[in-house]
């Protein structure tokens, strides 16, 4: 899969072309942990074509941060409009392949032991966590903090602002910046 990705991604110049090459498309989707969305090709194409600065664009209406990460990494559309990104850049290729293997490792471990998967997920995401709403957007991260901070699972039924307040009372997220 990696060989096909590296060999053919450079020939792709649009979201439509990416989706047409199922092997490359699948590799990219798995790299961004969007395997469960692989068959939503229309949604993915529209998301990749979305204007990242237009508040009502599809990209900005999607709440799952994985879509934004993929959109930014591929760069088919920027604030300047549609682009033809350089998908042969070695840094881009290495970033996507590293993401792919990290994600496969996390998912395989999660399938065998959910606790290990949760810890690996936390390790993968913790440096990018800026606020409690980012934690609450991820079921795994929410679960991790509930267990780590001895908070009841039932708190997930509360209003998001109340959940945020409970978490903030127990732990200062700024402590994650200095492990």
Where are these regions (language model features)?
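General marker for long, soluble alpha-helical cores
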Residues: 1-23, 27-179
């Amino acid at each position: 899969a990696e060989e096909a990705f590296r060999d053919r991604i450079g020939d792709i110049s649009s979201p439509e072309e990416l989706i047409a090459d199922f092997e490359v498309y699948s590799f990219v989707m798995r790299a961004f942990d969007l395997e469960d969305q692989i068959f939503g090709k229309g949604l993915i194409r529209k998301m990749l074509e979305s204007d990242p600065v237009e508040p009502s664009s599809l990209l900005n209406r999607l709440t799952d941060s994985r879509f934004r990460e993929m959109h930014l990494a591929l760069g088919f559309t920027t604030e300047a409009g549609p682009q033809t990104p350089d998908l042969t850049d070695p840094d881009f290729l290495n970033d996507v392949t590293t993401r792919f293997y990290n994600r496969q490792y996390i998912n395989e471990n999660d399938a065998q032991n959910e606790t290990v998967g949760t810890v690996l997920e936390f390790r993968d995401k913790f440096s990018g966590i800026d606020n409690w709403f980012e934690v609450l957007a991820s079921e795994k991260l929410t679960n991790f903090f509930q267990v780590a901070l001895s908070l009841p699972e039932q708190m997930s039924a509360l209003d998001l602002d109340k959940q945020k307040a409970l978490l903030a009372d127990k732990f200062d997220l700024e402590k994650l910046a200095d492990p």
